[in-house]
Amino acid sequence: HMIMIIPEEEYKNIPKIKPEIVKLVKETKENIWVHIKTPVDLWNYGLDSKYEFLDAVSASFPIYDNGFLGALRVANIHKTLVLRKFEKYVASYVIAGSLVRGTADKDSDVDTFVIIDDTDVKKMTRIDLLDRLRGIIYDYIREASALAVVKNILNVQVYLLTDFWQSVKDAHPVMFTFIR
């Protein structure tokens, strides 16, 4: 499979682009399926809970990358590490910021936030739990950056589920931005 991610403003040109790409692929005499997508298409796969497609794109071997794929790759590797450690406690792992808005460049940071379900934790205070979780999750940032071999800085905000919902009830503007 070959996936070509084009800017959103080029969406209307897909009927012109696809035949050219298919012609180039046929010249190679390889059996390659061509998929042309936009970043919005990728985010919609995530919204539709089709994470395996995003995983495949982030694990791909890019022929050309303007920074989008590298940023997606480092976030996906970090997500995998966090899920492996806290599997049943991760309520949400979300990519936000310029990457999702489509304004990121190759040097842009990658904004993510993780919401951890703390509702069954009884043996430590929420502050102690949050400090411990942040330490582990921040250690995974270094590991993900090394594995992804990208320069994009991964910024991770860690929230406990009870604190997140309390902030939503208090109409905290940051939480409403995340929900949007």
For each feature predicted by the language model, list its residue ranges:
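Catalytic core of pol beta-like nucleotidyltransferases
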Residues: 6-96, 100-107, 116-180
